[in-house]
From Swiss-Prot:
It comes from Shewanella oneidensis (strain ATCC 700550 / JCM 31522 / CIP 106686 / LMG 19005 / NCIMB 14063 / MR-1). The lineage of its organism: Bacteria, Pseudomonadati, Pseudomonadota, Gammaproteobacteria, Alteromonadales. It is found in: Cytoplasm. HAMAP family: Endoribonucl_YbeY (MF_00009). Single strand-specific metallo-endoribonuclease involved in late-stage 70S ribosome quality control and in maturation of the 3' terminus of the 16S rRNA. Pfam families: YbeY. This is Endoribonuclease YbeY.
């Protein structure tokens, strides 16, 4: 089954490397897999200031973060393909990639997959949930040709 994806990409910052809409769509489709027939999703790529503001407002943490996931929650009787929004901070992703000795492309792919899994309801608060989510992330990232994102962490 092929996913019918409506992806809105908003580039609200500049950087030496930002993934293309085609790359982002591939990573989203890989993460969503057969979970949905149709999906609508917005990915907003932001600077540290906007990330810090959103992270403070929605998570109570006064610092920028790599990815924020905002799932769309419709009433149960209404079926819509709206998955939600991802907000990804380019500078945090770049710094983490450098610190973890990963390519930018590999870390961007990981952040998109990670964020999409949150939108699908996965979480990593409890150890058991974290193991399940990390295992799935690893499978998906490796299917894209990248190495295990949690190796050596």
């Amino acid at each position: 089954m092929s996913l019918d994806l409506a992806l809105d990409v908003q580039y609200a910052t500049t950087s030496d490397y930002l993934p293309s809409e085609e790359q982002l769509a591939l990573w989203v489709k890989t993460a969503i897999g057969n979970s949905m027939k149709q999906a609508e999703l917005t990915i907003r790529i932001v600077d540290a200031r906007e990330s810090q503001m959103l992270n403070g407002t929605y998570r109570g943490k006064d610092k920028p973060t790599n990815v924020l996931s905002f799932p769309f929650e419709a009433p149960p009787e209404i079926e819509l393909p709206l998955l939600g929004d991802l907000v990804i901070c380019a500078s945090v992703v770049e710094n983490e990639a450098r610190e973890q000795d990963k390519t930018l492309e590999a870390h961007w792919a990981h952040m998109v997959v990670h964020g999409c899994l949150h939108l699908l309801g996965y979480d990593h608060i409890e150890d058991e949930e974290a193991e399940e989510m990390e295992s799935l992330e690893t499978q998906l990232i490796e299917s894209l040709g990248f190495t295990d994102p949690y190796k050596e962490q």
